[in-house]
């Protein structure tokens, strides 16, 4: 009898603990709720290259991997295929706009040189570069890592914490933009969708040989679109130190259709958007929009939550 009474008592206490003072059970915790945002700078390195370019295996694929490796924990890398890059997969409007903006920033800074808009080229944060800027290959691939280390230890103006969930092709993301040093003037935030495991053949110079049907090359993380436009959709006009801004983004990935983007002909890289769902990441980027072009401020990776 004592055992039965004890069991009943524990059950009553457990039920009571699940109710508030009004006797109602509290609402379930939101799995997408964003907690404290890290006061931390991360860098963005990006590479404009192609798949239909014989000489582009090294600067296109291998360099991408080397740059990504050298970033370490201090930043993130995104491979982009802009219009005119002779890529046969994921030629996106976002990549084209990003390349144009990177070039315009170089012009604005007075560092633009002939050939910068000829792929492949790469950048780190708001700086655009080509291999001709460096004396050796090692200098070339380690530069972004060195810059990322410096930026990591700089004062953090603001950062974004975000979480997303996929139900079918419907993506729901919640975010918190936290200001630490203050964001003066106009800023924007954008959310980029990338595929983190894209294997596609590299025409002319594949890993494993020069035959077009040889082993594929890894093109990852590969930009396939944006949830909020290339540089965001809404202006954030000033955010004082200590202030935060929260929001929700919903997007149906059936509208992304990145595999239908303009591209070179051929059957080397036929892609179905379905497998992307399992290999999908989302990056949140803060941009400074106080000039006619968008300057990089910070980047973070959204946490994926299982429904």
Task: Please tell me what each predicted stretch does.
Residues 79-307:
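Short, conserved sequence motifs used for protein processing/export or organelle targeting and
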Residues 15-18, 67, 203-208:
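General "foldedness" signal
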Residues 1-44, 307:
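Bacterial Sec-dependent N-terminal signal peptides
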Residues 15, 50-53, 255:
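Mature extracytoplasmic/luminal segments of secretory-pathway proteins
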Residues 33-84:
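Local sequence-structure signature of Cys/Sec-based thiol-disulfide redox active-site neighborhoods
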Residues 11, 38-41, 46, 115, ...:
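A broadly tuned, weak detector of single residues within folded domains
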């Amino acid at each position: 009898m004592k055992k039965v009474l004890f069991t009943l008592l524990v059950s009553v206490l457990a039920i009571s603990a699940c109710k508030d003072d009004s006797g109602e059970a509290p609402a379930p915790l939101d799995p997408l709720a964003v907690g404290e945002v890290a006061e931390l700078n991360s860098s963005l390195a990006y590479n404009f290259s192609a798949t239909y370019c014989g000489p582009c295996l090294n600067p296109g694929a291998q360099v991408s991997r080397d740059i990504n490796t050298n970033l370490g924990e201090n930043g993130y890398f995104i491979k982009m295929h802009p219009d005119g890059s002779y890529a046969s997969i994921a030629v996106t409007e976002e990549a084209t706009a990003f390349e144009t903006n990177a070039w315009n920033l170089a012009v604005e800074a007075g560092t633009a040189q002939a050939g910068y808009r000829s792929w492949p080229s790469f950048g780190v944060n708001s700086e655009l570069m080509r291999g001709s800027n460096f004396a050796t290959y090692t200098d070339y691939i380690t530069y972004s890592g060195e810059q990322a280390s410096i930026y990591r230890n700089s004062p953090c103006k603001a950062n974004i914490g975000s979480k997303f969930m996929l139900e079918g092709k419907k993506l729901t993301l919640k975010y918190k933009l936290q200001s630490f040093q203050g964001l003066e003037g106009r800023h924007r935030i954008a959310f980029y969708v990338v595929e983190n495991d894209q294997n596609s053949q590299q025409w002319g110079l594949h890993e494993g040989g020069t035959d077009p049907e040889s082993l594929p090359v890894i093109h990852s993380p590969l930009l396939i679109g944006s949830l909020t436009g290339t540089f965001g959709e809404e202006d954030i006009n000033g955010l004082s130190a200590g202030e935060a801004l929260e929001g929700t983004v919903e997007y149906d990935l059936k509208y992304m259709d990145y595999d239908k983007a303009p591209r070179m002909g051929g059957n080397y890289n036929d892609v179905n958007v379905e497998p992307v769902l399992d290999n999908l990441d989302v990056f949140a980027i803060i941009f400074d929009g106080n000039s006619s072009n968008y300057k990089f401020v910070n980047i973070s990776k959204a946490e994926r939550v299982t429904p």
